């Protein structure tokens, strides 16, 4: 039997992970773990790949296996915290971030992760308190500035929010998250034209930037330009090669609903239901029921002129995650 070169296999797994080939990466990390059952770094990377596929339960299992071997790993604790937060288990996520920060009092990832979880719990003041602590460690850290900007955005302090996004741009004028954040803020202020200019700026930086196409599609929906929005979502699909991404498919399903393409919308919501766990899964289930109801109304000529927003339509345009 040929002995596997663990380092080479792990490196190849990381390359596959970076390329978005998550299933192939998971298999490569499995090969590493089969050769060395204590390869906790491979378990961590495997968990990250599962997270990217929205398989949060599998991801947490991988992180727990890694932590059983290396319980002090700040990286694994932070990854587990992010995954739990994505799963909607915010208190459990905060516990992971607190443990990570206790192990490393300079972990900005832990503080930002905790702040984002608090945002989702609508605890914005507490989130700002955590981010203030992060600023004491590094006042120019881009992710911290983005997190503060998003928190202020949630508090409807739009001018202050934009000022923090601009602080990020002062250090990196090509930061697409900051441009997206400013665009989202303008959209929340009702200035769709300024929002579109920001998102177009992103495409001038990188025409393949997925979030920009999704954001433009979202604004077009707000402007009732549903056919233009659909073109944006189709472009985004082409960029990812049809690979599932929640924000993309949620926006696509919403747009198809507004265009009265109910059968297509239902199929997309079914894909979301099959791909997700937790709140997103049940939101998709409610949306399927909602669109079926609209379909029945259409059949008897009782469909409203303007389709109302579906239960699961994602209005959270956060850029800090």
Q: Model features per residue range: what roles?
A:
Residues 35, 69, 103, 137, ...:
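Structural marker of alpha-solenoid helical repeat scaffolds
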Residues 32, 65-66, 99-100, 133-134, ...:
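Canonical positions in the second alpha-helix
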